[in-house]
Curated annotation (Swiss-Prot):
GO terms for molecular function: large ribosomal subunit rRNA binding; structural constituent of ribosome. CDD domains: Ribosomal_L11. GO terms for biological process: translation. This is Large ribosomal subunit protein uL11. The gene is rpl11. The keyword Thylakoid does not apply. It holds the Pfam family Ribosomal_L11. NCBIfam families: PRK01143.1.
Amino acid sequence: MANVVEALVSGGKATAGPPLGPALGPLGVNVAAVVAKINELTKDLNGMQVPVKIIVKSRTEFEIEVGTPPTSALLLKEAGVEKGSGDKKNFVGDISMDQVIKVAEIKRKNLLSSNLKSAVSEIVGTCGTLGIKIDGLTSKEVQKALASGSYDHLFEAKS
């Protein structure tokens, strides 16, 4: 029977310390090998918090499934800032609609949206919470523009 360990690790920088070591040690698997594989699989997400699922089949056999980082982490990376404002009236960054679409495409399978436009709308809402503007506009202004069809040409190109 396989054991499953789920953890949130720093992309490309996982260590044998908590949370991985204490969870994997009792299973008898080579923790160093698991950590090395996680770091290899998450190196492109360097420094971002990444959810991983480790499926330990035996002492020598394991699989690793890498999830997508939280939407907020992807947006903060796109904006080049470390944390959101915490206040919807203060803005910490500004990203382009293309960057919002990029994040929506990455997160698409994890969202409840039925199409790219509604996925983008969800991401725009998160931008507002973090204090990130889109093309110089607030999230509310962008939501109105989305609803009126102002950005539809961008979604037609992606279909």
